């Protein structure tokens, strides 16, 4: 079953009123000091008076706030049009979800950017990291049966599944209200906040390099005393803490430039901290993963592994990734583990995209890389589920949602069962494998391929084999005269008559329910002269 546990930041009882215009679905909501921004969500209940002729039941729903006029008024879209013009009509209760934040990061060039007198009037100012507004990215952890929720530069919330899906997550009393990241240290069970407040409950005292941890077995107590295990530590080497991860025997903490270890020692110090690496920072809060005690992560210009020491991973596609990545959207970089295939995959935004559209995968057993185009914004490996579970955010989608939200603008998330079946959400998957160019006698002789014998296991549907030929390494490739060759499950051999100094083999399929596994293909090759 599904439920919405998004925390509620404000509730109002009986003082909401509505302004309507005859024949219009646009409704102005009156609520003094509402604190909402466009894109937030509000749920009304207990509506009275059928405001402007709109039935109470039509307003007792969840709405997206379309436009904010001022601190006391905003606009929603009613499911039905008003039948009269009214001002401050009816009454209602309201529950406001926490501010949605932005679905993308951007550089703020607004009034006040830079120092007085910088450059000339009308000239764009250089970007400033202190003025980068980040997308709202969440992280989750478990504290026993409870779920811990926190978003970057936000507060920390908890949700108890025993309360049921009708009960929302609530702020953890006594916890910091502004942190970069949070997780639970195990097995000692401290709640640890990274890049958090010097003074608990005072957001403007946030220190992006300060680590604070709660009392053991008590996530509501962060103030250290002589009789508890709460405390804190400021790290060095970096401008801000980016993320943290439980690993073998310690918590790994990444700043934008370095890696640190946090180990549980017990009283009187509780935790010990040491720097493990430099010039190896992490690109985003979800860009590091642990596989059997070995950590893999993506920085702003390379990939790294920590297995006791920090090492840069040789990457054959490094230029492809880092010369075409949108660093402004680094907050969205997300890593997923697929243990079934020994893979670690990072999803990221290409240079011209504000939303995830690319991935790069590293097979840590075979030390090979591959790349592709796919949008996934969250990933859970097998374990709790039989197959990996992933989500995709589509900023342009207007499809129906699981819960009815009136006035909902574009932007939807989809949930996928990964590695299940051979199609992609009901559509064919374009599958392919290419060989390198091969030759005879280091390319001195022409090469004649007269035929090949296909060898495909578990083949369902047809696939295509193509032969690309070229006379010189720098020459353009051209297909053979009989290209392409369609291979059915019963094809025994294929005559080709392909001639060139170098030949590349390409195998492709793009049919619904297509499935195949490449075996050992045999080809009939021979020398065919020097020109």
Across the structure, where does each feature detected by a protein language model lie?
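Beta-rich globular "head" domains
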Residues: 33-48, 191-193, 443-459, 505
């Amino acid at each position: 079953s599904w439920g919405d546990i998004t925390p509620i930041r404000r509730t109002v009882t009986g003082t909401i009123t509505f302004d309507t215009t005859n024949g219009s679905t646009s409704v102005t909501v009156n609520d003094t000091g509402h604190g909402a921004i466009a894109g937030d969500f509000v749920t009304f209940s207990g509506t009275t008076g059928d405001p402007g002729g709109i039935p109470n039941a039509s307003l007792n729903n969840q709405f997206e706030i379309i436009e904010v006029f001022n601190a006391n008024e905003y606009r929603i879209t009613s499911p039905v049009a008003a039948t009269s013009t009214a001002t401050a009509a009816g009454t209602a209760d309201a529950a406001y979800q926490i501010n949605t934040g932005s679905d993308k990061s951007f550089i703020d060039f607004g009034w006040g950017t830079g120092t007085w007198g910088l450059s000339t009037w009308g000239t764009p100012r250089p970007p400033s990291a202190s003025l980068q507004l980040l997308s709202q990215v969440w992280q989750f952890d478990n504290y026993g049966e409870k779920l811990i929720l926190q978003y970057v530069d936000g507060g920390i919330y908890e949700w108890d599944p025993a309360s049921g899906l009708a009960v929302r997550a609530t702020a953890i009393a006594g916890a910091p209200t502004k942190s970069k990241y949070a997780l639970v240290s195990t097995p000692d069970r401290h709640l640890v906040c990274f890049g958090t407040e010097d003074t608990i409950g005072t957001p403007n005292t946030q220190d992006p390099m300060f680590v604070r941890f709660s009392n053991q077995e008590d996530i509501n107590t962060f103030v250290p005393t002589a009789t508890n295990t709460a405390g804190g530590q400021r790290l060095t080497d970096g401008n801000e803490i980016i993320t943290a991860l439980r690993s073998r025997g310690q918590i790994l903490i990444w700043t934008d430039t370095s890696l640190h270890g946090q180990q549980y020692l017990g009283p009187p110090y509780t935790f010990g901290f040491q720097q493990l690496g430099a010039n190896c920072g992490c690109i985003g809060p979800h860009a590091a993963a642990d596989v059997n005690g070995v950590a893999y992560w993506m920085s702003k210009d390379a990939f790294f592994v920590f297995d006791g020491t920090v090492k840069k991973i040789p990457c054959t596609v490094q230029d492809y990734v880092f010369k075409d990545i949108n660093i402004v959207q680094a907050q969205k970089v997300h890593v997923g583990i697929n243990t079934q295939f020994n893979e670690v995959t990072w999803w990221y935004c290409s240079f011209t995209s504000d939303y995830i559209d690319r991935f790069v995968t590293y097979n840590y057993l075979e030390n090979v890389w591959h790349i592709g185009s796919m949008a996934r914004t969250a990933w859970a490996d097998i374990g709790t589920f039989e197959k990996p579970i992933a989500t995709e955010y589509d900023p342009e989608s207007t499809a129906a949602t699981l819960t009815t939200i009136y006035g909902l603008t574009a932007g939807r998330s989809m949930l996928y069962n990964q590695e299940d079946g051979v199609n992609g959400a009901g559509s064919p998957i374009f599958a392919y494998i290419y060989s390198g160019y091969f030759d005879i006698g280091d390319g001195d002789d022409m090469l004649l391929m007269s035929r090949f014998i296909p060898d495909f296991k578990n083949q369902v549907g047809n696939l295509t084999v193509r032969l690309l030929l070229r006379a010189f390494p720098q020459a353009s490739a051209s297909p053979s005269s009989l290209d392409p060759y369609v291979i059915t499950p019963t094809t025994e051999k294929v005559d080709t008559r392909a001639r060139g100094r170098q030949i590349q083999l390409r195998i492709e399929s793009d049919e619904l329910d297509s499935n195949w596994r490449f075996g050992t293909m045999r080809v009939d090759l021979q020398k065919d002269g020097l020109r």
